[in-house]
UniProtKB/Swiss-Prot annotation:
<keyword id="KW-0413">Isomerase</keyword>
<dbReference type="GO" id="GO:0005737">
    <property type="term" value="C:cytoplasm"/>
</dbReference>
<dbReference type="GO" id="GO:0003755">
    <property type="term" value="F:peptidyl-prolyl cis-trans isomerase activity"/>
</dbReference>
<dbReference type="GO" id="GO:0043231">
    <property type="term" value="C:intracellular membrane-bounded organelle"/>
</dbReference>
<comment type="function">
    <text>PPIases accelerate the folding of proteins. It catalyzes the cis-trans isomerization of proline imidic peptide bonds in oligopeptides.</text>
</comment>
<dbReference type="GO" id="GO:0005816">
    <property type="term" value="C:spindle pole body"/>
</dbReference>
<dbReference type="GO" id="GO:0005634">
    <property type="term" value="C:nucleus"/>
</dbReference>
<dbReference type="GO" id="GO:0006457">
    <property type="term" value="P:protein folding"/>
</dbReference>
<dbReference type="InterPro" id="IPR029000">
    <property type="entry name" value="Cyclophilin-like_dom_sf"/>
</dbReference>
<dbReference type="InterPro" id="IPR002130">
    <property type="entry name" value="Cyclophilin-type_PPIase_dom"/>
</dbReference>
<dbReference type="GO" id="GO:0005829">
    <property type="term" value="C:cytosol"/>
</dbReference>
<keyword id="KW-0697">Rotamase</keyword>
<dbReference type="GO" id="GO:0016018">
    <property type="term" value="F:cyclosporin A binding"/>
</dbReference>
<dbReference type="GO" id="GO:0045292">
    <property type="term" value="P:mRNA cis splicing, via spliceosome"/>
</dbReference>
<protein>
    <recommendedName>
        <fullName>Peptidyl-prolyl cis-trans isomerase cyp3</fullName>
        <ecNumber>5.2.1.8</ecNumber>
    </recommendedName>
</protein>
<dbReference type="InterPro" id="IPR024936">
    <property type="entry name" value="Cyclophilin-type_PPIase"/>
</dbReference>
<keyword id="KW-0963">Cytoplasm</keyword>
Length: 173
């Protein structure tokens, strides 16, 4: 039995509950990256107003069929926001030990080297071209069908979904 944390996200599209995605975090390999994500799932980190910050009620703002689904920008909701549990806007790449070698991997979205924050993506295909550029830190262990349903959501400009794809609840199992 793994001692690595398992988190969940309950997903709804335009208010219609799809179901739950469960993700195992690779805390033994990338502990800082995994902990940053875990705390944003639980809401235990407080923002400047002393209210919990995190993924609850945030959206998947970028979907590219045959590649990945991206979310986690609870700051601005459009892919420009960043926050960490480390009292900084970003944090360095922890390591690139894990590869983007299969669908269902959780990886950090970034704006270049050492620019990790709160945004993440889940792969829907192997993406070896991301190796050495994005930190893999978890994998979907249940609810991959939900990931695929999100991936099939129609998108408009900038790969932005035409529907509201929201994380309506999240936490740690």
């Amino acid at each position: 039995m793994s001692t690595e944390p398992v988190v969940f996200m309950d997903i709804a599209i335009d208010g219609r509950l799809l179901g739950r995605i469960k993700i195992r975090l690779f805390s033994s390999i990338v502990p800082k990256t995994a902990e940053n994500f875990r705390q944003f799932c639980t809401g235990e980190t407080l923002g400047v107003n002393q209210k919990p910050i995190g993924y609850k009620n945030s959206t998947f703002h970028r979907i590219i069929q045959g590649f990945m689904i991206q979310g986690g920008d609870f700051v601005s909701g459009d892919g420009t926001g960043s926050a960490t549990i480390f009292n900084s806007r970003t944090f360095p790449d922890e390591n690139f030990t894990l590869k983007h070698d299969r669908p269902g991997l959780l990886s950090m979205a970034n704006a270049g080297k050492d620019s990790n924050g709160c945004q993440f993506f889940i792969t829907t295909v192997p993406c070896d071209f991301l190796d050495g550029k994005h930190v893999v830190f978890g994998e979907v262990i249940e609810g991959y069908d939900i990931v695929k349903e999100i991936e099939s959501t129609p998108v408009g400009a900038n790969s932005r979904p035409k529907s509201n794809v929201a994380i309506v609840e999240c936490g740690e199992m």
